[in-house]
């Protein structure tokens, strides 16, 4: 009887520590969702794609996250553009699944706004006007509470001077 009570309490704590309406800003640096499980190993069954691999500072690019098969749905995300450890640029969301997150600067990360199953989402990333160099888009994807991948990298995108 006591064992069943302990299992129920631990299960309730696990459920309440999930973030069905988006990742908190406390996850910005590590990109770990704080779930009571270990992340899945890479490679993940998801792809981060962009239409080009070179752009100019101040320009925008569409970034698409998609499952590799119809079974590769996801319920949660945390998406950032990084140069090394620095989060760069601003995001625009185009759907009701997502919202912007402040990871040290307004609108520099995207997270989920609800836990509806998705297989593909797209966002617009805008490079800073004065930025030059390579960026990598990193996404943490939560399929279900105990199944998630941390900081899945895209191929690099080179940002050139707009001058």
UniProtKB/Swiss-Prot annotation:
Gene3D superfamilies: Reeler domain
GO biological process: defense response to bacterium; defense response to protozoan; innate immune response
Subcellular localization, as worded in the UniProt entry: Secreted
Keywords in alphabetical order: Antibiotic, Antimicrobial, Disulfide bond, Immunity, Innate immunity, Secreted, Signal
Reelin domain residues: 19-163
InterPro entries referenced in this protein's UniProt entry, alphabetically: Ferric-chelate_Red/DefProt, Reeler_dom, Reeler_sf
Family affiliation: Belongs to the insect defense protein family.
Function noted in UniProt: May have antimicrobial activity.
Protein name: Putative defense protein 3
Record organism: Antheraea mylitta (Tasar silkworm)
